[in-house]
UniProtKB/Swiss-Prot annotation:
PTM annotation, UniProt: Polyubiquitinated by the BCR(KLHL12) E3 ubiquitin ligase complex: polyubiquitination does not lead to degradation of DRD4 protein.
Source organism (scientific name): Rattus norvegicus
Keyword Glycoprotein on entry: yes
This protein's encoding gene: Drd4
PROSITE patterns: G_PROTEIN_RECEP_F1_1, G_PROTEIN_RECEP_F1_2
Residues passing through the membrane, by range: 35-57, 68-90, 107-128, 147-170, 187-208, 315-337, 347-369
Protein name per the record: D(4) dopamine receptor
Stretches the record annotates as Disordered: 224-278
Cytoplasmic side: 58-67, 129-146, 209-314, 370-387
Record note on quaternary structure: Forms homo- and heterooligomers with DRD2. D4.7 allele exhibits higher affinity for homodimers compared to DRD2 heterodimers, while alleles D42. and 4.4 have similar affinities for both. The interaction with DRD2 may modulate agonist-induced downstream signaling. Interacts with CLIC6. Interacts with GPRASP1. May interact with ADORA2A. Interacts with KLHL12.
Tissue: Central nervous system: hypothalamus, thalamus, olfactory bulb, and frontal cortex.
Coiled coil: none
Job description of the protein: Dopamine receptor responsible for neuronal signaling in the mesolimbic system of the brain, an area of the brain that regulates emotion and complex behavior. Activated by dopamine, but also by epinephrine and norepinephrine, and by numerous synthetic agonists and drugs. Agonist binding triggers signaling via G proteins that inhibit adenylyl cyclase. Modulates the circadian rhythm of contrast sensitivity by regulating the rhythmic expression of NPAS2 in the retinal ganglion cells.
Localization in the cell: Cell membrane
Comp. bias regions, Low complexity: 258-268
């Protein structure tokens, strides 16, 4: 990376100077609006995402693999509200002027990059998890620790993307101490590609493949259920017997005493059953045809988990769509200013797209409440207990 300064061209916190929105000497109308809006936004992010974390931790019905990633996403939003938003609002109230130390600015930039990247990487991790769950469900169900490892990987990669900022990348000659931004244009391009422009297409591709595979699985399951339905005769003639439908007796001799006295056949060895005096065309009673219940119970348990996960997946396109709607304008403006220093971008536009990106942190709990009945009922229960 080079050391070309991006001062005045904006970073993840807009990076505006005193000339942009105000003089920095008083709390004008724009500063008051920023203060009120910032306090409301911080309160909504803290309340909503805390409710998500408490609900998943306290209710077993919400403790699914998908919701573990949602908790990680909520944790990123909570950290953003605690570590980034207060200083961002402070800068906005001052009209874009940074009055604190440059070292604090660098820490703020690094936290902003890391948490924004963590949000995107968590959504990518959900797409990977859902893709594996749909394409190789049997192997997926046996790997209970994979979700935690994937979540840990998202945070480590996010920290790696943000690390250059705290390692001195922002310490460039002639730095303006009144502007808090990313100073290196090469790093702005690098972080934008790693944090947004590379993972987002991959995430969308995985979601497309996941929902396509899910539709195929449901179609195959529907066809299989119909093929197992009892067949009714379409015309005169002897009824067609279905060996899976109840007991049919055809010229069978009486059962042996061992069969009459034994309450279940599952305790008999297979050799006893193979010596049954039935003719090849006859069928034994239901008891003799009983199968061990363990595989069936496992299949039913897997079906229940799959059904719950399918319900959880319905909210994911809305979460991803809201994220892209809120953050795409910011990253487009962000990388445009880095690649085209001569291009003029209004400071007010920079401020608007930055606010829009941060608003996304407050949207996810609202989305869960509207589009997920399980979250909605648990939210109500949790709020009643806390009030």
């Amino acid at each position: 990376m080079g050391n070309s300064s991006a001062t005045g061209d904006g970073g993840l916190l807009a990076g505006r100077g005193p000339e942009s929105l105000g003089t920095g000497t008083g709390l004008g109308g724009a500063g008051a609006a920023a203060l009120v809006g910032g306090v409301l936004l911080i309160g909504m992010v803290l309340a909503g995402n805390s409710l998500v974390c408490v609900s998943v931790a306290s209710e077993r019905i919400l403790q699914t693999p998908t919701n573990y990633f949602i908790v990680s996403l909520a944790a990123a939003d909570l950290l953003l509200a605690v570590l980034v938003l207060p200083l961002f609002v402070y800068s906005e109230v001052q009209g874009g002027v940074w009055l604190l130390s440059p070292r604090l600015c660098d820490t703020l930039m690094a936290m902003d990059v890391m948490l924004c990247t963590a949000s995107i990487f968590n959504l990518c991790a959900i797409s990977v998890d859902r893709f594996v769950a749909v394409t190789v469900p049997l192997r997926y169900n046996q790997q209970g620790q994979c979700q935690l490892l994937l979540i840990a990987a998202t945070w480590l990669l996010s920290a790696a993307v943000a690390a250059p900022v705290v390692c001195g990348l922002n310490d460039v000659p002639g730095r303006d101490p009144t502007v808090c931004c990313l100073e290196d244009r090469d790093y702005v391009v690098y972080s934008s590609i790693c944090s947004f422009f590379l993972p987002c297409p991959l995430m969308l591709l995985l979601y497309w493949a996941t929902f396509r595979g899910l539709r195929r699985w449901e179609a195959a399951r529907h066809t299989k259920l119909h093929s197992r339905a009892p067949r009714r005769p379409s015309g005169p003639g002897p009824p067609v017997s279905d060996p899976t439908q109840g007991p049919l007796f055809s010229d069978c001799p009486p059962p042996s005493p061992s069969l009459r006295t034994s309450p279940t056949v599952s305790s008999r060895p297979e050799s006893d059953l193979s010596q049954s005096p039935c003719s090849p065309g006859c069928l034994l009673p239901d008891a003799a045809l009983a199968q061990p219940p363990a595989p069936s119970s496992r299949r039913k348990r897997g079906a229940k988990i799959t059904g719950r996960e399918r319900k959880a997946m319905r909210v994911l396109p809305v979460v991803v769509g809201a994220f892209l709607m809120c953050w795409t304008p910011f990253f487009v403006v962000h990388i445009t200013r880095a690649l085209c220093p001569a291009c003029f971008v209004s400071p007010r536009l920079v401020s608007a797209v930055t606010w829009l990106g941060y608003v996304n942190s407050a949207l996810n709990p609202i989305i869960y409440t509207i589009f997920n009945a399980e979250f909605r009922s648990v939210f109500r229960k949790t709020l009643r207990l806390r009030c």
